[in-house]
């Protein structure tokens, strides 16, 4: 059925289209933290996230990364390939920050000699727990070969993103990716890439990401607008 709500999320809603293999993603003006425990409506946020993510995914597509992104169709909407989402959040850390610093008792801002890839089990009831490769296999999420692919592809994407953000004066601290199986059973990058799911610091150490909301550091949309303008100029 066309235009049927398939999924209602914290930051995005997903609808069916005339093509059973294509979905319409609508970005919402909502910011959340602590797995939705704190919610706030922020005018214009959805459009900024959509435009930033569209620009990043277009560049990833051109760089040869297989993604679900098809095209942006309005300021807060885009068309994507339908995928079966793998219930893992794949996190890559270039610099210590956030929950990593709290978990291991290290200060924020330490550059990691080798970027660290982590898995988190996508399960709201369990608060998305940190898990390892053995847990992933025990839960039957993906196999050894697919785990290796997820890690390798995440590292490849990191190298591309670090380079692009460095060109616009931003340091990519860490980020979260989601992947899914397309209709042919191939793993492709899904979800979004925006300051909602990454940390970006400018040369002065200012936060240019969702930490502005988490830590009450200022106006979130002003910061996202700066990131968007920098990416447009790239």
Curated annotation (Swiss-Prot):
From the UniProt record, give one GO term of the biological process aspect. cobalamin biosynthetic process
Which keywords describe this protein according to UniProt?
ATP-binding, Ligase, Nucleotide-binding, Purine biosynthesis
Task: Name the Gene3D superfamilies on file.
Answer: ATP-grasp fold, B domain, Phosphorylase Kinase, domain 1
| Recorded catalytic activity of this chain's protein | 5-amino-1-(5-phospho-D-ribosyl)imidazole-4-carboxylate + L-aspartate + ATP = (2S)-2-[5-amino-1-(5-phospho-beta-D-ribosyl)imidazole-4-carboxamido]succinate + ADP + phosphate + 2 H(+)
Main EC class the enzyme belongs to: ligase
A GO MF term: phosphoribosylaminoimidazolesuccinocarboxamide synthase activity
By its UniProt entry, which InterPro entries does this protein fall under? Answer: SAICAR_synt/ADE2_N, SAICAR_synt_PurC, SAICAR_synth, SAICAR_synthetase, SAICAR_synthetase_CS
Q: In which pathway does it act?
A: Purine metabolism; IMP biosynthesis via de novo pathway; 5-amino-1-(5-phospho-D-ribosyl)imidazole-4-carboxamide from 5-amino-1-(5-phospho-D-ribosyl)imidazole-4-carboxylate: step 1/2
- The Enzyme Commission number assigned here is 6.3.2.6
Q: Which domain of life is it from?
A: Bacteria
Protein family (similarity comment): Belongs to the SAICAR synthetase family.
- Which HAMAP family does the UniProt entry name for this protein? SAICAR_synth (MF_00137)
Q: What is this protein called?
A: Phosphoribosylaminoimidazole-succinocarboxamide synthase
Organism of origin:
Streptococcus pyogenes serotype M3 (strain ATCC BAA-595 / MGAS315)
